[in-house]
Curated annotation (Swiss-Prot):
Pfam families: DUF1811. InterPro entries: YfhH, YfhH-like. This is Uncharacterized protein YfhH. Homodimer. The gene is yfhH. It comes from Bacillus subtilis (strain 168).
Length: 104
């Protein structure tokens, strides 16, 4: 039985990320788009567990990785930041903290 990311050590997480990245590269080479999307999401989640949620603050606004969107955190629950994108302030959503970047 596989371990949950929350139960893995940083070394195990880095090993898992490397393994998933290799699988994602192969899926992309073979044009398996669905598999690539799943693997990229797993990589994002594993990276979130390498970060410290205490480095992210409710009320702060961050840029969402690979988009032009900004995201304001309402609260944190584990490695997920709950809040609102500036483009859709009525719709609350949760994002892994690994996709949040400091605004420039």
């Amino acid at each position: 039985m596989e371990k949950r990311y929350s139960q893995m050590t940083p070394h195990e997480l880095n090993t898992e990320i490397a393994l998933l990245s290799e699988k994602a590269r192969k899926a992309e080479q073979h044009g398996i788009i669905n598999e690539l999307a799943v693997l990229e999401r797993k990589i994002t989640m594993a990276k979130a567990y390498l970060l410290n949620p205490e480095d992210y603050s409710p009320g702060e606004t961050y840029r969402v990785e690979n988009t032009e969107d900004e995201f304001t955190i309402s609260y944190l629950n584990g490695v997920f930041a709950w809040g609102y994108r500036t483009s859709s302030p009525q719709q609350e959503e949760a994002l892994p903290i690994s996709v949040l970047q400091e605004k420039e």
